[in-house]
């Protein structure tokens, strides 16, 4: 998927340059830890920021929560370098409470989607009852180990009255995009943030969960308490929250939260 155009690149570079001149005096290495929900748009936008500012952005990827080796809280506990943290909003709040982060800027809203292997039959998911039937009929179901998966496994299955039915067929997928598992044929149905599903080839996204089952997740950015380049980090956050980033964010399947760039 193409996230940029010549016009967008010019606007983005100009916006990033203005932000940088306002926020920092010299080029720096900016260490970022980011979870999967915003990563596709982020990966498309970072080169524009680097061109405009001369900064080098070094990125580590991992879930917003949990204890896996790549999880952002685990990385911070290991003392890995971090200037900017981009993850689920309430997970960032937890890091602020623990003294690991110092701020929060809400960037996007993200909805959960449903996917099947490319070319496979597309079950009806238009209503809660339809989703229930699709899940019960599926031989295997996959969900993530981050925010969407926590909701699906602890709330949505219970709401549908299928927790017992899902016990053996539904699997939490750690440290791997759910869409990759679906594309390989290892799960018949996959559920994760739409932006994460869109980033993987080999799947068909049926659509978002119906509103009665939907769980909108806010992805936010903050400065790490141990940051060595807080001003450069703030400039990056301002750029990601600016109008220049909007087209790329929307194309990745996310909804920008307006008015957060400061």
Please describe what each predicted stretch is.
Residues 1-13:
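Bacterial N-terminal signal peptides that target proteins for export
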Residues 4, 15-17, 34:
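Terminal low-complexity, poorly structured segments
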């Amino acid at each position: 998927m193409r996230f940029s155009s010549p016009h967008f690149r010019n606007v983005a570079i100009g916006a990033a340059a203005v932000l940088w001149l306002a926020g920092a005096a010299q080029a720096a290495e900016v260490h970022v830890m980011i979870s999967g929900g915003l990563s596709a748009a982020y990966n498309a936008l970072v080169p524009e920021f680097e061109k405009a500012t001369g900064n080098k952005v070094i990125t580590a990827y991992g879930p917003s929560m949990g204890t896996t080796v790549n999880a952002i809280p685990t990385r911070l506990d290991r003392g890995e370098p971090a200037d900017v943290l981009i993850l689920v909003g309430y997970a960032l709040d937890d890091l602020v409470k623990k003294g690991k982060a110092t701020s929060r800027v809400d960037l996007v809203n993200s909805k959960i989607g449903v996917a099947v292997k490319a070319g496979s039959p597309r079950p009806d998911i238009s209503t809660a009852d339809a989703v229930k039937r699709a899940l019960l009929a599926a031989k295997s179901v996959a969900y993530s180990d981050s925010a969407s998966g926590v909701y699906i496994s602890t709330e949505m299955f219970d709401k549908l009255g299928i927790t017992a039915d899902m016990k053996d067929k539904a699997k939490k997928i750690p440290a791997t995009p759910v869409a990759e598992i679906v594309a390989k044929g290892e799960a018949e149905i996959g559920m994760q943030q739409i932006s994460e599903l869109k980033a993987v080839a080999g799947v068909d996204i049926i659509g978002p969960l119906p509103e009665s089952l939907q769980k909108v997740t806010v992805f936010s950015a903050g400065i790490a308490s141990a940051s060595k380049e807080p001003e450069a980090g703030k400039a990056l956050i301002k750029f990601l929250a600016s109008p220049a980033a909007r087209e790329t964010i929307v194309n990745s399947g996310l909804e920008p939260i307006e008015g957060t760039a400061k």
